[in-house]
């Protein structure tokens, strides 16, 4: 599975660390230096590595959770600690490592800053809806600043797992179903996290995850097996990871899932051959939580009650050997490396060059991060760096940019601020759930509820909860307790008393994220019944959805005149949503993932491959569902409405042919034909109609979000090269085949305006 082309290796410049740690190069010898005559990072790494005992090397390969990290462990020289967020404790543990371990190697502290640290931004799936990489980069920039101020120098982000599975809860953490959009957003997050030099005081080390194809679990069930072809892996799932690596991501996290029978954290093909060798990645790979231990076979009676299950290792030593041989450099939580590493060396099941390579990678990142020069943080400044006004303002803008208007019949929106509003629903005055899954250190009180945001813009606003969505977890969770209908009469009365109604519906944050797979994608509980009863009042109403995945909205749309997809918007949820509802912000987001008509269509995605019998619901022997009148999703990838209207026209190609090293530029005009200033996302797709292996019916290759005043026209330009029209074959080789390439430009994946050129 070697490959070139779109996923080809690219060297990333990393700023040298200029201050030499005391005594690290003692012992003489010629040392490589940089242009200023100072020791290079690799020279410092090699000098330090030469002093280390086997035990010290294995300790560097150990990553502990906050609850495991003690002063004694720090003195042993552990490599990393995650989820500790108290700066005083971080300093204390760092002091033990730097002052009281033999070689004074600092600890790399890490945290899951997925969409914000204290200033929680929209979930990444929501930010992908902005089709604006600056939104993701700003989120990461502010998250890095707040995280680093606490003494944490690594973030387990970006999460770039492409997914076609709305049943899978972690779809909330990625950028949806498209490899190109996912790649653009992945690179933007890395740039925000690391900047040009991640040793800077306000920057952190990015860790791209979960490598690889974690977003394709069978049945959409968390942690489940992934099975896919080579061409699907290379064309669809790997590009966002590669984009993050090309952007400079210094570390990576391997995945829980098995890929074609080999677990991600013991997978030599993905970890060593692809990531390290083919892509030239010189950082380190950490395992996910107990993923090394989970390689073990579960015994009939599990006396230590430890993690196990994959069954490719008989015991702890076997698991450690499998992970090290696969390419996992650092073990999270479980301790098989430090417990059995020396035994495995003696038994020749692993080698010292493998250990040295892993430790060299870990030390390289620590030196580049400036930890040897600046291991400590000022606790008095940590709190002052959180929730700053510029961060809150940026979050409000990001949240409104990430919202998608799905329906707006009869100009139900924008709301009239001079008329009364009834906010109704279980999420209407909610703060907790607005932060979404992986809320960092965000606090419920940080968040602005929808009711508060609307009332700030229209004082004549009331709130009626109507029902509860309990934040309970299995085994205590019972779907029958979701949104009971006993208080619906109060909601109906409130609706009848108001001029306009806003229904705040969706999921709790506990229903989304890790370990939250759902078999049903309808609104939980009796929320649809609530919609039906409000619809029966005849009052104009809008459904605002707070959720972390695509939902089945067929019945919702049948009853609702307006639907706004707000996702989990973050700390400024209420204010940002009110900005959109009242028209202060014209919604311009587009869906980064398809919304199915029915859960039985899943997985459904726009860039699917064709069949010999394309769907025709009127023909029995075509690829269709007997009980559906369409093969399309309910809402397609790239879809989204506005309070104004746009027209995309005049598609032109600069050439009728593309030479092997040449390019073709596509231009199109986009005009605001309505009465309000607004944003349109112009999208370019291609199709290769005749190829040696089937090609997707559409592939997104470019997009641009533009702001236009009424009547204004702008010409957008997209440059296509062979990298855009080629593909990976069944052997993982990137090829560009001569022949026709169809270009489509429009406002969604259903674009119809088309021209063609010939690739030579």
Located regions from the model:
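C-terminal effector modules
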Residues: 754-755
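Glycoside hydrolase catalytic-domain context in secreted enzymes
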Residues: 3-4, 8, 25-726, 735-749, ...
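N-terminal export and membrane-targeting signals
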Residues: 1-19
């Amino acid at each position: 599975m070697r490959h070139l082309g779109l996923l080809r290796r690219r060297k990333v410049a990393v700023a040298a660390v200029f201050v030499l740690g005391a005594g690290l190069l003692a012992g003489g010898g010629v040392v490589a230096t940089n242009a200023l005559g100072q020791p290079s990072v690799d020279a410092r790494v090699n000098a330090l590595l030469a002093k280390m005992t086997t035990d010290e090397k294995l300790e560097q390969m150990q990553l502990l959770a906050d609850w495991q990290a003690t002063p004694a462990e720090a003195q042993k020289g552990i490599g990393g600690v995650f989820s500790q967020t108290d700066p005083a404790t971080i300093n204390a543990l760092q002091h033990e490592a730097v002052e009281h371990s033999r070689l004074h190697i600092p600890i790399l502290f890490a945290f899951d800053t997925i969409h914000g640290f204290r200033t929680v931004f929209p979930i990444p799936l929501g930010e992908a809806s902005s089709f604006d990489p600056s939104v993701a980069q700003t989120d990461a920039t502010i998250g890095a600043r707040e995280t680093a101020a606490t003494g944490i120098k690594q973030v387990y982000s970006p999460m770039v797992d492409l997914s076609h599975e709305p049943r899978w809860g972690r779809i909330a953490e990625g950028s949806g179903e498209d490899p190109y959009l996912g790649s653009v957003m992945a690179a933007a997050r890395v740039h925000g996290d690391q900047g040009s030099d991640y040793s800077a005081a306000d920057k952190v080390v990015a860790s791209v995850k979960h490598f690889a194809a974690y977003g394709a679990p069978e049945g959409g069930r968390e942690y489940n097996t992934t099975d896919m072809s080579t061409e699907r892996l290379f064309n669809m799932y790997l590009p966002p990871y590669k984009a993050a690596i090309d952007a400079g991501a210094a570390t990576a996290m391997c995945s829980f899932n098995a890929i074609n029978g080999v677990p991600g954290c013991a997978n030599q093909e993905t970890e060593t051959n692809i990531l390290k060798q083919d892509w030239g990645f010189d950082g380190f790979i950490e395992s996910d939580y107990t993923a090394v231990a989970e390689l073990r076979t579960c015994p009939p009676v599990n006396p230590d009650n430890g993690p196990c299950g994959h069954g490719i290792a008989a015991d702890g030593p076997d698991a450690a050997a499998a992970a090290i041989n696969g390419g996992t450099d650092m073990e999270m939580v479980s301790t098989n490396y430090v417990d059995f590493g020396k035994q495995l060396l003696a038994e020749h099941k692993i080698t010292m060059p493998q250990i040295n390579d892993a430790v060299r990678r870990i030390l390289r990142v620590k030196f580049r991060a400036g930890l040897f020069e600046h291991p400590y943080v000022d606790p008095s400044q940590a709190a002052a760096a959180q929730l700053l006004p510029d961060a809150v303002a940026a979050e409000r803008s990001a949240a409104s940019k990430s919202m998608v208007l799905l329906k707006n019949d009869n100009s139900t929106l924008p709301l009239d601020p001079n008329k009364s509003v009834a906010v109704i629903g279980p999420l209407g005055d909610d703060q907790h759930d607005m932060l979404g899954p992986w809320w960092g250190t965000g606090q419920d009180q940080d968040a602005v509820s929808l009711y508060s945001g609307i009332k700030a813009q229209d004082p004549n606003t009331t709130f009626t909860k109507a029902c509860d969505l309990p934040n309970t977890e299995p085994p205590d969770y019972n779907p029958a307790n979701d949104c009971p209908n006993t208080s619906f009469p109060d909601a109906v009365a409130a609706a009848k008393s108001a001029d306009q109604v806003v229904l705040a519906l969706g999921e709790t944050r506990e229903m989304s994220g890790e370990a939250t797979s759902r078999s049903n994608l309808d609104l939980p509980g009796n929320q649809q019944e609530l919609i039906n009863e409000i619809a029966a009042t005849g009052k104009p109403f809008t459904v605002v959805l707070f959720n972390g995945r695509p939902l089945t909205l067929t019945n919702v749309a049948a009853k609702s005149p307006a639907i706004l997809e707000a996702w989990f918007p973050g700390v400024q949820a209420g204010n940002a949503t009110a900005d959109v509802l009242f028209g202060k912000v014209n919604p311009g987001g587009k869906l980064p993932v398809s919304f199915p008509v029915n859960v039985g269509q899943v997985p459904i995605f726009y860039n699917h491959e064709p069949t010999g019998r394309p769907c025709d619901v009127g023909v029995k022997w075509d690829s269709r569902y007997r009980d559906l009148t369409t093969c399309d999703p309910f809402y397609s990838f790239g879809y989204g409405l506005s309070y104004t209207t746009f027209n995309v026209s005049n598609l032109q190609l600069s050439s009728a042919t593309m030479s092997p090293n040449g390019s073709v530029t596509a231009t199109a005009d986009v005009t605001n034909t309505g009465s309000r200033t607004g944003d349109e996302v112009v999208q370019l797709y291609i199709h290769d109609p005749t190829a040696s292996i089937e090609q997707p019916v559409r592939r997104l290759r470019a997009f641009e979000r533009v702001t236009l005043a009424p009547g204004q026209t702008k010409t957008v330009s997209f440059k296509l090269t062979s990298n855009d029209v080629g593909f990976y074959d069944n052997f993982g080789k990137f090829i560009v085949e001569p022949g026709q390439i169809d270009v489509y430009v429009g406002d969604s994946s259903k674009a119809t305006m088309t021209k063609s050129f010939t690739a030579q």
